[in-house]
Amino acid sequence: MSSLKGKTAFVSGGTRGIGLAIAKRLASEGADIMVAGSSEANCAAATRAITAQSEGRIEAHAVDLRTLEGCQAVFDAHSRVFGGCDILVHSAGATRGGVFPDQDDADFIDGFALKFHAGVRLSRLFWPLLAAAHGNVVMIVGGASRTPDAKFMVGGAVNAALANFSKALAGQGLQDDVNVNWINPGQTETERLQQLLSTRARDENLSIDDVRAERMQAEGIRRLGQPEDTAALVAFLCGDEARHIHGAGIAVDGGATKGYF
């Protein structure tokens, strides 16, 4: 498939989990890719993995997206390499699990810095390039943005803020011809999910298998998602066939979300 051939994409958090799956999928459809990750080792591994299934140009940049300087640095790197940008995917931002009120301010500050503030900053920096290209923004948010969980307060608060920002950004996109959508992945088999399961198992003195089974039962789902499930939707949203989908938040959660909003 080459529906995105000639396009350039930037994927934050693109070295692991859902972000890596997104970068692979976009590259397999012909896009040139820059991914940003938190370490040189992750960036090197991601570059090898993406290059193995793509003939396009693949670049990776290790950076701390929690800071304005980090966001600026990765934007400058992308601009030097590619010049323009057709697709911005913000997938960075694992928040810390825990039980309130034991979680302190640092957990909330860190969560907002990496997922929310980085999303805002990257959108601001890349916006002129995206407007020039009549491009696409896809934010990877999360179902907790709509269904608060007392045991996932940091993630829920951050996700809700990012979803609200994404909807507002879509309004600006109507004026500047930039498509903006966001995705709410459900329980997805990643290292991040394993960390959350481990944290809850520790806090509640349960086994990880028990926590996993409890979570699936509570959400009424038959299976956990795979990163490729979300990646497939991102690729579709960035293609011409999805041009009239704008300002939408779409769940990829196996039916876990019970409401229809």
PLM segments and residue spans:
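Alpha-helical segment proximal to the catalytic Tyr-Lys
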Residues: 128, 171-172, 243
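Conserved glycine-rich cofactor-binding loop
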Residues: 8, 15-16, 39
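Short, small/polar-rich loop/turn modules that mediate ligand/substrate recognition or access, typified
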Residues: 174, 179, 245-247
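Substrate-binding pocket helix/loop in short-chain dehydrogenase/reductase
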Residues: 71, 99-100, 104-112, 215
